[in-house]
Amino acid sequence: MKKGRLIAFFLFVLLIGTGLGYFTKPAANNITLGLDLQGGFEVLYDVQPVKKGDKITKDVLVSTVEALNRRANVLGVSEPNIQIEGNNRIRVQLAGVTNQNRAREILATEAQLSFRDANDKELLNGADLVENGAKQTYDSTTNEPIVTIKLKDADKFGEVTKKVMKMAPNNQLVIWLDYDKGDSFKKEVQKEHPKFVSAPNVSQELNTTDVKIEGHFTAQEAKDLASILNAGALPVKLTEKYSTSVGAQFGQQALHDTVFAGIVGIAIIFLFMLFYYRLPGLIAVITLSVYIYITLQIFDWMNAVLTLPGIAALILGVGMAVDANIITYERIKEELKLGKSVRSAFRSGNRRSFATIFDANITTIIAAVVLFIFGTSSVKGFATMLILSILTSFITAVFLSRFLLALLVESRWLDRKKGWFGVNKKHIMDIQDTDENTEPHTPFQKWDFTSKRKYFFIFSSAVTVAGIIILLVFRLNLGIDFASGARIEVQSDHKLTTEQVEKDFESLGMDPDTVVLSGEKSNIGVARFVGVPDKETIAKVKTYFKDKYGSDPNVSTVSPTVGKELARNALYAVAIASIGIIIYVSIRFEYKMAIAAIASLLYDAFFIVTFFSITRLEVDVTFIAAILTIIGYSINDTIVTFDRVREHMKKRKPKTFADLNHIVNLSLQQTFTRSINTVLTVVIVVVTLLIFGASSITNFSIALLVGLLTGVYSSLYIAAQIWLAWKGRELKKDSAQ
C-alpha cells in the first residue's frame, strides 16, 4: 500500500474543507442580489424623440443612459443596471429602491424646464440655466421648501420679466416642467393639482440671475426637483412598455424560502449519494461542495446579478452535476462486476464515461445559451447560472472527482474493497469466465423495453391527440408576460379572502379580472388586470397596500407589444434550441438519432404545455425557462442511451433486426439505473423547491417536475424506439439487397 497517496488524499480533503469553510460565506455575501431577492424596480422604456421628425440614434441612446445613471445616483442606487436593447429601448433595473413611486417619477421626468407667459409662449428654457445651479433651500419669509436656480444672463431675464409685467392682469410667469404641446395655463390653473410648477405674478423688472421656484413642495420634492435639474434633461421621451416592482419584504422572504429549499434538497442528495455509492458517493459530496463554491465565486467575479431563478438554477445544477458522477460510478461498477481489479475498473470506467458526459453537457448548454439570448432579465440570470453550473460541474465532477478517487485507488488501499463502490459481491464474476461480449449484471436485465414498442407508440400518439384537443378546448392560461396587462401581488401577515382583495381594489377604482390566493396561509393575493394602469394609479396602489398591510405590493405591467414579442421569442427559443441539438447530435452520432431525440423532446415540451392547459396553471416567462431546461435535460438522458447504443453497435456490428433489437434493449437495461438515479436526484431538488421555495417559482418547479418524469418515459419509449424502428427498416433494406 502506498501511504503517500493516502496522506495526500486526506491533506487535499482537509485543504478543500478549510477553504470552503473560510471562503464560501464571503463569496456568497459579495454577490449582488436581483430585484426579486432584495426588492426593487425594473422598467423597459420605449425611447421616442422629443421633437417630431428627430431620429433616435446610438449616440442619443447613450446620452439617455448617462442621464438615467445620474438620476439613479439621485435615488441613492449605487449599482444601477441600465442597458440599451435594440434600436429604441432602454431597460433600467434598480435593486434595493425603497420608494418605487419616487423612482418612477425621477427616472421618466424629462426635466425640460421652461418659463412661459399666460398664453403659453416660451420665454426661457433649460438652455438658459447655469449647469448644476439648482439647489433646495427654504423661503426666508414662509420657511417653506423652495428650489433656487441660476440663470446665465441677468439682462435676458430682465427683458422677460418686463414683458410679462406689461401683460397685466395676466402678468404670470408660468414655470413648467415637461410642457407638452396642448398644455394650457388657463385650463390648468382651474385644477386642484395643476401640471405647472409655479405661476408667480410679475410686478417689476428683475435683472438677476437668481430665481426662486415656489410650488408648495415638501422638502423631499424640492430636493428631487433640484437634483433632476442638475442631472440634466433627458434628450428623449420615455414610455413604459414593461415594468415590474418587488417589495423588499417579498424579496427577503423569497430569498429565505428558496435558500432553505436548496439546503434541504442538497442535503438529501448528499445522503443518497453516500448511501448508494458509498466511497465514490463521499467523493461526490466533496466535489459537489466545491462546485457550489466555485460557481458562487465566479458569479461574484463576473459582477453578475443573482435572481430567484438563478438560485433555482444553482440548486438544479447540483442535481445535474450529480449526473456526471453517477455516469462514471455506474461505469466503474460495471467494470468491477466483470471481475476487473479496482485500478483497472477505475481507469476503464473513467475512459468510457468521458464522451457520454461531454456530449450530454454540450446539448444542455445549447438550450441554456438559447435561453440566455431570448430570455427576459430574470430568465437571463437563470440561463447564466445554468451555463456556469454546467461548466463548473464538468470540471469538478470529471477532473476533481477523478483526481481524488485516483489517489485512493492508486494507493492500493481499495484493492480488496470492491464493496466500498456499492457493488454486491454476488454480482462480481470471475474475470476468467468473461470475454469482450460478456455483459455485467444489471438490476433490469430481465426487463424487455422493446417488445411492446408498438403499444407505446399508440399510447404516445393518443396522448398527443388528446393534448391537441385539450389545448383547442381549454387553451393556455397566459400570464401577463404573454397576454399583456397588469399583475399586482399583495402580501399580508394574516389570511386574505378574494372578496377582501377585490374590495381593496374597488376602493381604488380598479376592477381586477381575476383574484387568486396563494401562500401557505393564503396570505398572498394575486390580482390580474386586462389593461395597463398609469403611473398615478400604480402609485396609489403601492401607497394604499403599504399603509394597510405593511409591505409594498409587487406590480408588473406588460404592454401588448412586449407581450407579443415575448411570445414570439419563446417560439424562436424552442425552435433554435431544437435545431442546434439536431445539428450537434447529427455530427456526434447520426441524423436518425438526432431526429428521434428531437421527437422525444418535443413530446416532453408538448406534454408540459398540455398539463398546464388542463390544470389552468399560469404560463409566464419562467415556464419557457422550464421547457428549455427540460429540453436540455431530456436530451442529456437520451444522449446517454444513444452513446451506449453506439458503443454496442461498434462492438457487435448487427446484421439483422433481431441483433439491433437486442442492442437497444441491452443499452436501455444498462443505462436505466443511471436514468433513475439522475432523475431521482433532480426530482429531489425540484420537490424541495416546490414545497419550501418561493411561491413565485412554484409553477416553474411544477413544469420541471412534470418534464422530468415525462423525459424518462420519452427517452426510453420514444427516442430509442423510433431510432430502432427507423434503423431496423434500413437494415432490412440493406440485407434484402
Swiss-Prot record:
Disruption phenotype: Cells lacking this gene show a cold-sensitive phenotype and a filamentous morphology. Signal peptide: none annotated. SUPFAM superfamilies: Multidrug efflux transporter AcrB transmembrane domain (SSF82866). It holds the Pfam family Sec_GG. One of its GO terms (cellular component) is plasma membrane. Residues 1-5, 276-278, 323-353, 402-453, 591-593, 643-677, 721-737 are cytoplasmic. Induction: Shows maximal expression at the beginning of post-exponential growth phase and increased expression by glucose in the post-exponential growth phase when cells are cultured on rich medium. Expressed constitutively during growth in minimal medium. The chain crosses the membrane at residues 6-26, 255-275, 279-299, 302-322, 354-374, 381-401, 454-474, 570-590, 594-614, 622-642, 678-698, 700-720. Residues 1-416 are annotated as: SecD. One of its GO terms (molecular function) is protein-transporting ATPase activity. It is found in: Cell membrane. Part of the essential Sec protein translocation apparatus which comprises SecA, SecYEG and auxiliary protein SecDF. Other proteins may also be involved. This is Protein translocase subunit SecDF. It comes from Bacillus subtilis (strain 168). The lineage of its organism: Bacteria, Bacillati, Bacillota, Bacilli, Bacillales.
